[in-house]
Amino acid sequence: MIMNGRWSFNTLAIIFILLSTAALSAHFRVCEPYSDHKGRYHFGFHCPRLSDNKTYIFCCHHNNTAFKYCCNETEFQSVMQLNLTANSDSFAHNNYTALIGVWIYGFFVMVLLALDFLYYSAMNYELCRVYLEKWGLGGRWLKQARSQWHSTVQEGELNTGPGLSQQQQLHLHHHHHHHHPRHSLRGDTQSPTLLSFQTSTAW
């Protein structure tokens, strides 16, 4: 259990680092839409473009008289007069809402993955049990769950068995009562004819 806890903590730490770096780097890699000094609107784009070098991953912009373009890290720091290492912390503080959104999105993704895993394990219980026992994870809790499952199944069978027999007995008893008056009626209807036949033979 300790190894599983450490593994999950390391996984969450790696996911946090990757999401943070992706959010920080994506801020400088997007050239947002803008209007130049003549009032013409220009669409935004993501760096690097297909025609650019793969190292041009940052968006450079001198002023409104020049177009935005993709540049490398050294040109970006000289043109924009920014230090990426110094401004990463300030950017994280200024855009904490974006980081919160990323964290919420990641949380829901993890919840969906956990629910998907639980659904799959419930649908394929025997297969998961075999793999858990093979990996050494089928400990006391798995045996207890299996024994509880079998006990509930047996109790359900015992509870449904006598109930069905009682229903069948009631059905048969009710069916017998429906057929019994017919025999008595037939006996009653046949008895006058027999009496008349006996009296006619006696005369």
UniProtKB/Swiss-Prot annotation:
Keywords: Glycoprotein, Membrane, Signal, Transmembrane, Transmembrane helix. Glycans are attached at N53, N63, N72, N83, N95. InterPro entries: Shisa (IPR026910), Shisa_N (IPR053891). The keyword Acyltransferase does not apply. The chain crosses the membrane at residues 98-118. It comes from the Eukaryota. Coiled coil: none annotated. Its main location: membrane. Residues 161-170 have a biased composition (Low complexity). GO terms for cellular component: membrane. Residues 119-203 are cytoplasmic. It is a single-pass type I membrane protein. Residues 171-184 have a biased composition (Basic residues). It holds the Pfam family Shisa_N. Belongs to the shisa family. This is Protein shisa-like-1a.
